[in-house]
Each structure stands twice: as C-alpha cells, then as structure tokens.
Amino acid sequence: MKQLFRQWYDLSEIKKELTTRNWFPATSGNISIKVSHEPLTFLITASGKDKTKTTPDDFLLVDHLGVPVLETELRPSAETILHTHIYNNTNAGCVLHVHTTDNNVITNLYSDAVTLQNQEIIKALDIWEEGATINIPIIENHAHIPTLGENFRKHIQGDSGAVLIRNHGITVWGRDSFDAKKRLEAYEFLFQFHIKLLSIQGGVSNGANSYS
C-alpha cells in the first residue's frame, strides 16, 4: 500500500508540472507509473479528466491487460494499450504521452521517422558520443486502437524510448518517472529547436519533407 501511495504522489506531481507547460490541452494525453512488477500493476490517468485539476479520481490502478484492479466507475485512458505494451515488454517504470504543437508539427514534416543530431541535450537520452544522431519513429494515428497498439509495439526496443503518432502526440517511456520526464523534456526541446531552425532557414525545403 505504501508503494501505491508513493507512486500516486509521484505521478500526481508529474501531472502538475506537465500541466503548467500546457502539454495536456483539452483533456488530451495520458501518463502512467508502474506500481508492482509481479503481478504487473500500474496507475494511469482516468479518461476524459481535466488534468489542470487535482482530484482523488485522477488515476486508477490497472493490471497487465489495462483492466481496473478494483471496482470503479472510472475508465482508463483510451490509449492504455500503448502503456500495457511497454510495461509487458520492458522494465520501464513510467510512460508519458502528451500532445504539443511542436510534436504534432514534426509528424507533418516527416513520414516514417525524424532524424535529429548534433545537439548537446541528446545526452539526456543517455547518448554520449559527439555529434550524436537520433531517430524517432512516426506511426499513423489509427482510429482502431488495437491496430494502433500493434504498430506501436513494433517500435518498443528497450526500457526507454519514444514514438511519435501522426497528429497525436508523443509517447515517451523511461526506467522511472525522473528518466521518463527528462527524456520527454529533451525531445520537446529538440522539436522546438528544429522547427525554429527550419523557419529561420526558409522552411521545409531546407531540411524536411512536408508530409500531409
């Protein structure tokens, strides 16, 4: 029970911080944190909640299938399947899915992936070589959630990572809440920088292919 309360508090603090950045517009986005490994349980945001508010109904505890552990009228977020795929296939401890203008714009500039390089903040992703390059996959935003989940699952390759969904934000996961939030902040910085650089250079013709 102590672990449940500890993780609830941790996830609530992350929600508050990301809310101040306006990364949950119009109730969008979902976040989760692992509570136990065996059996697998995790807290995840309830569907349709205003994340600028803090209430006792912000999160619910679900199992490895994303099914609520306790009887509740709350529904887990629509994209819970993405979280279950991550937790069932890695040792990740926290998953953050947010919609920002920048990460949506990026998915309209590129088709299958975006490549970013030679930025100091890439070290926040535990990549230390000079002039490092990263590739972030972009998948289509299927309305059929099982199809979306299956396409997403193909890009889960470790205890930390990120996948962009076209016009549907980014999902980032990490070893724990600190790691996941750090990675999310790094990706969002990189997206913002990249878009600003393209605008200064004269648009997508200098560095990206418009995809729409």
UniProtKB/Swiss-Prot annotation:
Alphabetized UniProt keyword annotations: Amino-acid biosynthesis, Lyase, Metal-binding, Methionine biosynthesis, Zinc
Q: Which Pfam families match?
A: Aldolase_II
| Cofactor comment text | Binds 1 zinc ion per subunit.
Which residues are involved in binding Zn(2+)?
H97, H99
Pathway it works in: Amino-acid biosynthesis; L-methionine biosynthesis via salvage pathway; L-methionine from S-methyl-5-thio-alpha-D-ribose 1-phosphate: step 2/6
Q: Which cofactors are named for this entry?
A: Zn(2+)
Task: Give GO BP annotations, semicolon-separated.
Answer: L-methionine salvage from methylthioadenosine
Q: Tell me the superkingdom of the source.
A: Bacteria
Q: Spell out the reaction equation it catalyses.
A: 5-(methylsulfanyl)-D-ribulose 1-phosphate = 5-methylsulfanyl-2,3-dioxopentyl phosphate + H2O
Q: What does this protein do?
A: Catalyzes the dehydration of methylthioribulose-1-phosphate (MTRu-1-P) into 2,3-diketo-5-methylthiopentyl-1-phosphate (DK-MTP-1-P).
Q: What is this protein called?
A: Methylthioribulose-1-phosphate dehydratase
Q: What is the lineage of its organism?
A: Bacteria, Bacillati, Bacillota, Bacilli, Bacillales
Gene that encodes it: mtnB
